[in-house]
Design a protein with these regions (language model features):
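Gram-negative outer-membrane beta-barrel transporters
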Residues: 467-469, 489-582, 680
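Transmembrane beta-barrel wall of Gram-negative outer-membrane proteins
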Residues: 102-133, 138-175, 215, 220-231, ...
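Short acidic/polar hinge/loop motifs at secondary-structure boundaries
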Residues: 2, 39-67, 86, 183
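A beta-strand signature from Gram-negative outer-membrane beta-barrel systems
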Residues: 55-97
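C-terminal beta-signal and adjacent terminal beta-strands/loops
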Residues: 570-586, 612-683
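Face-selective signature of the C-terminal outer-membrane beta-barrel domain
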Residues: 215-381, 409, 413, 419, ...
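Extracytoplasmic beta-strand/coil segments of soluble accessory domains associated
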Residues: 2-39, 55, 61
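Membrane-embedded beta-barrel scaffold of Gram-negative outer-membrane proteins
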Residues: 227, 231-239, 407-409, 415-423, ...
Length: 683
């Protein structure tokens, strides 16, 4: 993904399993992702869980990443960034293919692809079947992913109708606790994983074998493209996604009352025991999108469209096993201890006009209205010490999101552009649950972009300046809830500003050099923390979490007579785990204070991919190769959390601290040097 301003994370350490991307420091829940123009983000969390769409990249023909506010045509919730994926076009000729990969940490992938080609000049079908598995770099961080992709289409002179279905089934062992450096040192390994850990009566450590996430997601899309006249087109789509799954975990020392195993009046309400619980989700997401596109093929293009989506999801928890049942009068199988329903409806309409005033100079205006109605009701999994929190909520939002821009093609080599966009985004389910009894406000973003591009036969370059001014931006605090999800809260006024550079040079046919870099300044203007005496303290202007000031990417590509080599490097600057600006907290211990880091240190990694493509009788094409990841075995962390306390020291200065506790910062480790071989056959 060779795009400026991007960083990635991986729970398992080697890229297979739970992973995510951040764009310009924007967390994944603020990145709008679509497939064929249809929303992929989970409607409640706004996240995309890529493990639920295993090997989907093998069925993607084109991926457009738009930094900043995306256009209305790229989805209802375009906000901090947009990723629009177009699945593969159905080819006119039949084919079959097999892709095989295997490498470090017992990682392997098997993919079978086929296409029928055009049948009777109108019909065609295409498909993919995939299996991915890995034990992960982190201990027990195994992943098993099974998926398919199928599409069939009718192709007429003016009409194209396609039906697409794809799914994903995953089983992933938990690795979201992110241990502290101190825990890694005690364990004698940076691969240490505390998820599933428990002790028997003799004090021996064990790991629960089913401490895993299980999920099945099924997608259906029906797409219509109709040419009405040479200048007018109609596009429409229906979609439905079914999701069901759960995660199972061993919990030590939990109160019987917390899980409704005894009544509130019971003398054993606070009695603790070990148990196994499941948290389940059963949801349906469906809707429709449509648009009319007009192009007079001279100087005017216009689009009018909209969409409607509904999400209906049940969240509930089951107790599967209890170690000590002597105080439980009647333990039912699959005892349900909470049940909450979320119902979210989202509608939007938009209009976009692009007009070329004179040759080379054009402008566009994009206006969108969006309405959201979000309801939640029933007890949640949040226990307040007395009972499960009942979360009855209904919120309605109405957003007007205007955008406008100018583009000037100076000549065949030079062009400039400028744009402005106003965007809004509602809080996620996690935002509401993690901030119960707090008045949450929708986010607002004013995004200004200004850029220049140069394009010639052998060299291209571009520079983009951006200023993203937020009001009530939800920023990650650095803290996690008990299932490893990051907690966010409104930041008041904040901003992200920077410059992005891109360049590519290909002096000869067999060599290409690509590079990009981002310099940025990301700040919260008035970040407050709660001191240990309960008072709020304003830290003033502070750096935003997970937002490096500098990112650099570089690729050298050699391609000669079937042999291809690509040397890829990335440098990522320091990232703070909180919004306080503190680089460390002080663990106050009897034998002296100990400073514990609260940052992701800068890192530089290099990957090398080698491949050779050749032909054999009976086989159209064979490609064999090997990818060497983290070539110089850099030891770095790709993600983390921190949750110290804050107080004023003897000089009245606010400091981050804990009382003899080095466990309040944890890290996701990345794998050192590792290898993945790959072999592909095309028939």
């Amino acid at each position: 993904m060779f795009t400026p301003s991007i960083t990635t994370t991986s729970d398992a350490g080697a890229g297979i399993g739970y992973s995510s991307i951040r764009v310009r420091g924007t967390d994944p829940s603020r990145i709008n992702i679509t497939a064929n123009g249809i929303p992929v983000n989970d409607a409640e969390s706004s996240q995309v869980f890529w493990t639920n769409m295993g090997d989907f990249a093998s069925s993607v023909e084109n991926m457009q990443i738009q930094r900043g506010v995306g256009t209305s045509t790229n989805g209802a919730g375009a906000f901090g960034a947009t990723i629009n994926m177009q699945t593969e076009k159905i080819g006119t000729k039949p084919y079959a293919g097999v892709d095989l990969s295997a490498g470090s940490y017992a990682s392997h992938k098997e993919t079978f692809r086929f296409g029928t080609g055009l049948i009777k000049n109108h019909w065609a079908f295409q498909g993919r079947l995939s299996h991915i598995a890995s034990d992960g770099y982190v201990d027990r961080a195994s992943t098993r992913l099974d998926s398919y992709f199928l599409q069939g289409g009718y192709f007429g002179e003016n009409t194209v109708v396609k039906f697409i279905t794809f799914n994903g089934k995953e089983k992933t062992y938990h690795a979201w606790n992110y241990p502290s450096v101190y825990e890694m040192e005690l364990a004698g390994s940076r691969r240490y994983n505390s998820c599933g850990e428990y002790y028997d009566e003799a004090g021996n450590v064990h790991y629960y074998k089913d401490q895993s996430d299980f999920y099945h997601q099924q997608h259906y899309q029906l797409l219509l493209n109709q040419i009405i006249t040479p200048t007018l087109k109609f596009n429409a789509a229906l979609h439905y996604t079914k999701g069901f799954g759960y995660y199972e975990e061993y919990k030590s020392g939990r109160k019987l009352g917390e899980y409704g195993l005894v009544g509130a009046e019971s003398a054993y309400f606070k009695t603790k025991t070990d148990l196994v619980r499941q948290k389940l989700m059963d949801n349906d997401f469906y809707g429709a999108v449509a648009s009319f596109d007009y192009d007079n093929r001279q100087n005017l293009r216009a689009t009018v469209g909209g969409g409607w989506n509904r999400y209906d999801g049940d969240h509930y928890g089951l107790v599967k096993w209890v170690k000590n049942t002597e105080h439980i009068a009647d333990l039912q199988p699959n005892h349900r201890y909470y049940s909450n329903n979320g119902d979210k409806r989202d509608a939007n309409i938009y209009g976009k006009v692009s007009y070329e005033f004179v040759k080379g100079l054009s402008a566009y205006v994009d206006l969108q209205y969006r309405h959201i109605n979000y309801k939640m009701d029933g007890p949640t999994d949040d226990f307040n010490g007395t009972t499960q929190q009942v979360f009855d909520l209904e919120q309605k939002y109405d957003f007007f999101n205007p955008k406008a821009g100018l583009f000037y093609q100076i000549n065949r080599n030079h062009s400039v552009y400028a744009s402005y966009a106003l965007a809004h985004k509602e809080p996620t389910r996690n935002d509401f649950e993690d901030n119960i009894n707090t008045h949450l406000r929708a986010e607002q973003l004013n995004d200004w972009e200004l850029g220049y591009k140069y394009q010639s036969e052998k060299f291209s370059a571009g520079v983009n300046f951006y200023y993203m001014a937020y009001r009530d931006q939800f920023v990650l605090t650095g803290e996690q809830n008990e299932i490893g999800e990051f907690i966010a809260r409104n930041a008041g006024e904040s901003y992200r500003r920077g410059v992005e550079l891109q360049a590519a040079w290909s002096p000869v046919k067999w060599f290409r050099w690509d590079a990009n870099a981002t310099w940025s300044h990301n700040r919260a203007k008035d970040w407050t923390v709660t001191l240990d005496d309960g008072t709020a303290y304003n830290l003033g202007d502070t750096p935003l979490s997970f937002s490096p000031d500098f990112i650099f990417n570089n690729i050298f590509t050699f391609d000669y007579r079937g042999f291809r080599a690509a040397l890829t490097s990335q440098y990522v600057g320091k990232q703070r785990l909180s919004n306080t600006g503190f680089d460390y907290y002080v663990s106050e211990e009897e034998n002296g204070n100990h400073n514990v880091s609260m940052v992701l240190k800068r890192h530089f990694i290099t990957n090398l991919d080698l491949a050779y493509t050749f032909r054999m009788k009976g086989v159209k094409r064979i490609t064999a190769g090997c990818t060497f990841y983290n070539l110089f075995s850099a030891k770095y962390f790709n993600n983390g959390w921190t949750a110290p306390s804050y107080k004023k020291d003897g000089n009245g200065k606010v400091v981050a601290y804990t009382s003899s506790d080095r466990y309040e910062t944890g890290y996701a480790v990345s794998a050192p040097f590792n290898v993945m071989g790959h072999l592909s056959f095309e028939f």
